């Protein structure tokens, strides 16, 4: 049997502001942005450049209980992990683009890591795993 996770839904306040952040600040690719009239919503998918795996489905909150989770989808823990082939290139570019890092870079046994916030406050790891770490 072969299975894989294709999308992770990320609850957002507004499609366009989320697209702006992920595409213009994090340099993700906009894979799809399709309006679904029957449900009055958009199917918006973004993915890191060069990714061949999981993508983010940007899902606009449509109910009060969904709004409560914007920016806190992991209960204050790191929610998503962005692996890179060049930590310092991406860290420096992200700082120049105004990304807020809440924990500075650290060398760990598994590689180099720093924690940043997305536009809503969800925590992400930017990391470069060392050669001994499987993905």
UniProtKB/Swiss-Prot annotation:
Residues 4-129 form the VOC domain. CDD domains: VOC_like (cd07263). PROSITE patterns: VOC. Pfam families: Glyoxalase. It comes from the Bacteria. To B.subtilis YwkD. This is Uncharacterized protein Sfri_3691. The lineage of its organism: Bacteria, Pseudomonadati, Pseudomonadota, Gammaproteobacteria, Alteromonadales.
